[in-house]
């Protein structure tokens, strides 16, 4: 069982880890805090080493947890011969380009500020996505609520026609994720 926790002290996660231990189930902790309870009690530990979290939205920890899970998935795929060593290396190489891509986004302050100024008075913001994009929509909506205190919800794109669309009115911002 893989247990992911920023602090390594999350009560529900610790309880799950201890239940696994009682039942002789191997555990891997993915944690940020060295020496935390989960780090000490898990059979193996993968440290994200994101450093202290300043933001209430825990953006650094979340990002490093995703990367840790991705790298672990790559290793599983390689061991199971689902991908070759070369493919794995290519995926890791692409992953290493993320810091530069993040830097470019953050440097585009004028466009970000312009957009934010146009949308800051939105009463509601809906994030829409399908499959993996829905997961990203859930996290995007949570981050928006935690940081801006604007009401936000995430919906699976396929559910839009089942009532959700009736919630969209003038002044509602809709963020659609179409990565896949």
Where are these regions (language model features)?
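Phosphate/diphosphate-binding loops
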Residues: 1-69, 74-77
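Long, low-complexity, intrinsically disordered polar/charged segments
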Residues: 1-5, 10, 166-176
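Active-site phosphate/pyrophosphate-binding segments
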Residues: 44-175
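Conserved small/polar residues in nucleotide/adenosyl-binding loops
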Residues: 179-180
């Amino acid at each position: 069982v893989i247990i992911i926790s920023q602090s390594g002290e999350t009560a529900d996660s610790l309880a799950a880890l201890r239940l696994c231990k009682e039942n002789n189930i191997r555990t891997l902790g993915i944690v940020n805090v060295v020496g935390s309870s989960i780090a000490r009690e898990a059979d193996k530990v993968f440290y994200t080493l994101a450093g202290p979290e300043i933001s209430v939205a825990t953006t650094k920890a979340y990002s490093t947890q995703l990367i840790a899970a991705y790298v672990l998935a790559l290793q599983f795929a390689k061991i199971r011969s689902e991908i070759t060593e070369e493919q794995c290396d290519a995926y890791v190489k692409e992953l290493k380009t993320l810091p530069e891509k993040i830097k470019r986004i953050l440097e585009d302050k004028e466009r970000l500020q312009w957009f934010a100024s146009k949308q800051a008075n939105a009463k509601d913001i809906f994030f829409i996505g399908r499959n993996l994009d829905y997961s990203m929509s859930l996290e995007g909506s949570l981050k928006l609520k935690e940081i801006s205190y604007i009401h936000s919800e995430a919906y699976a794109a396929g559910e839009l026609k089942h009532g959700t669309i009736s919630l969209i009115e003038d002044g509602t911002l809709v963020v659609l994720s179409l990565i896949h």
